[in-house]
Amino acid sequence: MSEKSSNQGVLFLKEVNGKWVWFKDGDEKTDLKYEGEISNEVPNGQGTLTYPDGQKYEGEWKDGEWNGQGIFTISDGTKYVGEFKDGTDWNTTGYDKDGNIIGRYVNGTEQ
């Protein structure tokens, strides 16, 4: 039976046979770690996904994917800030570690 209410928790994202799958248990050294709101056994609401190499997405989730306002930070300090849709940049602005604009996505297309 699926969890239908939203609550705080931790999940791990792993690639299994070419598909990305959410698990309740994982290894922070090799798997992506999600901390935040969970419903229906996947991220839904506000949360943070941390990659083993230090990359991080902080923001809104829907049905296990980045959806809504968020910030994706790459390990070199580059950030993409704005709206994400279905796990990808939708309407975002990219900034280097010094805060200079380095790019934009508008309706999912890099400008």
Please give the residue ranges for each predicted region.
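Glycine/tyrosine- and acidic-biased, solvent-exposed loop/turn segments at the edges of beta-strands
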Residues: 1-111
